[in-house]
Amino acid sequence: MAKLTKKMKAIKAGVDSTKAYEINEALALLKQFATAKFNESVDVAVNLGIDPRKSDQNVRGATVLPHGTGRTVRVAVFTQGANAEAAKEAGADLIGMEDLAEQVKKGEMDFDVVIASPDAMRVVGQLGQILGPRGLMPNPKVGTVTPNVAEAVKNAKSGQVRYRNDKNGIIHTTIGKASFSEEQLKENLQALLAALAKARPTTAKGIFIKKVSVSTTQGAGVQVDQSSL
């Protein structure tokens, strides 16, 4: 069995894994133990009261966090004509059609988000086997297939997070960086949970948001008392 590092021993001693902490206390604990030499991400895991085996209970969407994610996001847009100009003005990093598709086929994928106008899906559709496994395939459910590409670019650049439950019915995403203030992290988390509540499937029964835990890149998970949000 691997030995625990001094940091992990300190975290285990300082965090009660059986306790749900008041949100401000939970975030203070996270920041206390975020001692990596880089600016750690603050991640959240939300256990949902859904049956992920049923397609009509799967939760997928996107929302813009009020304080962003702290990440610089590179955006590629498949579009043409006036939409291409609008995407450029909105701050898109890469814009094209067949030429951009050829770059993707060559493995040149220096971007984090892919957006497409509906007329470009005939080109993007050919890239499903490349973009799909990387979670980059545009999808109207998360607003990345849209006639308003400029708005989608602005959302991506301003701190939009996409979410999708895993096979255990858990949403994993980020709500910022350890350098954010506790208030910024709290407001980002509240915005995410509000978006999830709106995305509740009509067929989901009982308690929808069952458990919320926050963690940093190299830290332990801290369960949050939802009544404090």
Curated annotation (Swiss-Prot):
GO BP term, pick one: translation
Tagged with keyword Ribonucleoprotein: yes
Coiled-coil regions listed: none
Keyword Zinc found: no
Entries under InterPro entries matching the protein: Ribosom_uL1_bac-type (IPR005878), Ribosomal_uL1 (IPR002143), Ribosomal_uL1-like (IPR023674), Ribosomal_uL1/biogenesis (IPR028364), Ribosomal_uL1_3-a/b-sand (IPR016095), Ribosomal_uL1_CS (IPR023673)
UniProt xrefs under Gene3D superfamilies: 3.30.190.20, 3.40.50.790
GO cellular component, one term: cytosolic large ribosomal subunit
Gene Ontology molecular functions: rRNA binding; structural constituent of ribosome; tRNA binding
Pfam family, one: Ribosomal_L1
UniProt keywords, alphabetically: Repressor, Ribonucleoprotein, Ribosomal protein, RNA-binding, rRNA-binding, Translation regulation, tRNA-binding
Family, as annotated: Belongs to the universal ribosomal protein uL1 family.
Subunit structure: Part of the 50S ribosomal subunit.
Function: Binds directly to 23S rRNA. The L1 stalk is quite mobile in the ribosome, and is involved in E site tRNA release.
Name of this protein: Large ribosomal subunit protein uL1
Species this protein is from: Actinobacillus succinogenes (strain ATCC 55618 / DSM 22257 / CCUG 43843 / 130Z)
Lineage per the UniProt record: Bacteria, Pseudomonadati, Pseudomonadota, Gammaproteobacteria, Pasteurellales
Protein encoded by which gene: rplA
